[in-house]
Amino acid sequence: MSTRLATLRAALAVTATLLPTAAWAHVGHGSTVGFVHGFVHPVTGIDHVLAMVAVGLFAANLGGRALWAVPLSFVSVMAVGGVLGVAGIGVPFVEAGIAISVIVLGLAVALRWQWPVAAAMALVGIFAIFHGHAHGAEMPVDASGLEYGLGFMLATALLHVVGIGLGIGIARFGRTTSPRVIQFGGGAMAVAGLGILTGVI
């Protein structure tokens, strides 16, 4: 357990180093608007929230280096997708890709996939393009692009941390029941993703 806690601390340290503090939001009006809108965008969409938390749960299930490498892969590739969105460079099937990400990542949690870290990083990276593009394409015209991007990157990283915290926290309650709770949650995410894909949600 001490090893897991040490790895989690390392993941938090990487997040703190990579992403900005709220001070970035006070450079000017455009910066404030950009950072706030960027931060709010991921947390106000159920599809984004479910996928981000699922990434954290997936990483927690894999453990070890995956605790920081998998979320870092998502945030990094998402930034590329965000640039594409801001630049108006099209990515096909963005909305479908986001919904499918909720389904697949939910299944990864529900079925407790034990993938190599590199494969898990590649999987989440594919889906990160869609999420990042959606964020970038919806940037307000009066927002600062840099601060907007930093805002949604920070919010995404925090949602990953929530997922990691849930995964590790629930695992402490018992080896028999805790995996089932996490698997049930993953299954619920996958079902929700199917609802998003079909337009029911």
Task: Report each predicted region and the residues it spans.
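Membrane metalloprotein/metal-transporter helix-bundle signature
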Residues: S2-I201
